[in-house]
A protein has these predicted regions:
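Active-site bordering "gate/hinge" segments
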Residues: 1-198
Length: 198
């Protein structure tokens, strides 16, 4: 989440100081934030699949993720601990050819998601390991301070991008996946569907 943390810090300082940023910087932050969301979800899901002994699914998610890390490295100079947002904007603009390169990577990400879902959506062994296991109710999730996909997996329809929109998120058409019973299955599938929305 380095990119999201970097953007969150810059936005907080900008809000405190009353600094506005150019639209170009806003859209760069949205794009990079959504990429960070995809990478984070792939890490969570990939680690879960490794723990379950499902290495094929791990590679379907991790191989495209590596290409996004390479994109971030080329753009920011670092794969993981990138710091690219600056108070008042960004360090620099995207490089030439970034758009077609990134669209190619995103097609691979989507294929990895689809291939993984094909393997697990109706797989009885997988479903036995994740459905109705470690249920967390909406009330408990709120009481424990859950946020993000774990909160939404417990049935709480709350996402800052929709509920307190910033950076023009109110002008984007996207859905917020929400779970129904808060089990491992819901926590995993909320992440799958959020990646597709990103």
């Amino acid at each position: 989440s380095a990119m999201l943390n970097n953007v969150g810090y810059a936005k907080a300082v900008e809000d405190i100081l009353g600094v506005s940023i150019p639209d170009r910087a806003i859209f760069m932050r949205v794009i990079l934030g959504e990429l960070a969301r995809i990478i984070d979800h792939e890490v969570c899901l990939g680690a879960m699949f490794v723990d379950m002994g499902a290495l094929t699914n791990y590679w379907y998610l991790y191989n495209p993720r590596e290409k996004i890390y390479n994109f971030l490295s080329r753009l920011t100079g670092a794969r993981f601990t990138n710091s690219f947002a600056r108070i008042g904007g960004m360090a620099h603009d995207f490089y030439d050819g970034w758009q077609s390169e990134l669209l190619g990577y995103l097609k691979e990400v989507e294929k990895g998601i689809d291939d993984t879902l094909t393997l697990v959506e109706k797989n009885r062994i997988f479903l036995d390991r994740v459905q109705n296991i470690c249920k967390i109710s909406a009330e408990d999730a709120l009481s424990y301070g859950f946020t993000g996909p774990n909160l939404r997996a417990s049935g709480v329809d709350y996402d800052l991008r929709k509920d307190k929109p910033y950076y023009y998120y109110d002008s984007f058409d996207f859905n917020i996946p929400v779970g129904s019973c808060g089990d491992i299955h819901d926590r995993m599938f909320v992440r799958f569907y959020e990646m597709k929305e990103s």
